[in-house]
């Protein structure tokens, strides 16, 4: 039987399953899954990647590095990028590196099928092999599903920040963990003791989900941030600038998460911790709600600048059950 070889490369099991579900049922295809760029390159070198569906932000070897390696090694593969990094510069870079198409996460199944058809990828000369598709009935953990949800959200937020600052935002793979109350208090207390940090806090609630967002800046980088935003530097204007930036970043992240889990969040006004409230006060007010906390850590970097800022999303214990219910369809 003549089949097309397809490699699906994404560090998220959830994202790979979504791609597999979207493939046309009548397409004779042999699918290889890759969890990082190294595995992807191994598959393409073996001739298993006539078509490559590629994520960008992955540990060990990311999608940009894969595209560079394909070019350097002279390997031919028809690449469709599907990514949560939706910055205009990200789209431009992958096109320049040879990608045939760019789809934004979460992608529409019909859009992927149309893209495969438009590019003629379902009519490629096949190889003599058995059609093979991985099973779709594997269970995925809540942490994995929520990490992919957050991945989409931070990508949208980065696209907004990139426009505001006129820079390329380097996106991390988010860390998702459930913390016991003592672990959370220790982490927050450590942040509170650091004299070189300025933290902005913003509460949110909606649809049975509640929590706090903390955005932390290193004081040494605030003047550089102000220059990028063309603010006049003074203590009051710097704090105003941080509040503006925090509103954009936190607001975009939360609105994307809310959209994906089908709720609407109400957000409190952002506060500068230490000026409007302290870390100790934040812990005291929330100690009843924060017995167990779903914590998401994201560290953004700005390319070409020595600037990093860290976003911490903290969801209450009650929110975990609600989020699990909302995302159950992705876990099975």
Regions inferred by a protein language model and the residue ranges of each:
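Active-site residues of response regulator receiver
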Residues: 55, 83
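A Lys-centered signature of the CheY-like receiver
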Residues: 105
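Two-component/phosphorelay signaling modules centered on CheY-like receiver
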Residues: 13-32, 72
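Receiver (REC) domain active-site loop signature in two-component systems and cognate sites
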Residues: 58
């Amino acid at each position: 039987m003549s089949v097309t070889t397809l490699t699906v490369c994404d560090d998220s099991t959830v994202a790979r399953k979504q791609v597999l579900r979207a493939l046309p049922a009548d397409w004779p295809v042999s699918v290889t899954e890759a969890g990082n760029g190294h595995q992807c390159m191994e598959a393409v070198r073996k001739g298993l990647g006539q078509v490559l569906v590629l994520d960008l932000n992955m540990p060990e070897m990311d999608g940009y590095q894969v595209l560079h390696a394909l070019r350097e090694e002279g390997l031919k593969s028809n690449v469709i990028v599907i990514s949560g990094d939706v910055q205009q510069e990200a789209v431009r870079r992958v096109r320049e590196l040879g990608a045939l198409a760019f789809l934004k996460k979460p992608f529409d199944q019909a859009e992927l099928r149309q893209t495969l058809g438009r590019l003629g990828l379902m009519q490629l000369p096949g190889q003599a092999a058995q059609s093979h598709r991985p099973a779709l009935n594997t269970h995925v953990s809540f942490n994995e599903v929520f990490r992919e949800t957050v991945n989409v959200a931070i990508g949208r937020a980065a696209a907004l920040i990139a426009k505001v600052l006129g820079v390329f935002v380097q996106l991390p793979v988010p860390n998702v963990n459930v913390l016991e109350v003592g672990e959370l208090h220790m982490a927050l207390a450590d942040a509170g003791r650091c004299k070189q940090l300025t933290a902005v806090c913003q509460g949110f609630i909606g649809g049975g989900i509640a929590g706090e967002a903390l955005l932390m800046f290193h004081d040494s980088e605030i003047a550089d941030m102000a220059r990028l935003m063309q603010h006049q530097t003074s203590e009051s204007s710097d704090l105003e600038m941080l509040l503006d930036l925090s509103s954009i970043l936190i607001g975009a992240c939360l609105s994307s998460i809310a959209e994906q889990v089908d709720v609407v969040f109400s957000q409190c006004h952002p506060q500068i911790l230490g000026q409007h409230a302290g870390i100790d006060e934040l812990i005291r007010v929330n100690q009843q709600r924060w017995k167990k906390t779903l914590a998401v850590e994201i560290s953004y970097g700005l390319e070409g600048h020595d600037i990093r800022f860290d976003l911490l999303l903290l969801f209450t214990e009650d929110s975990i059950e609600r989020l699990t219910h909302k995302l159950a369809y992705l876990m099975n």
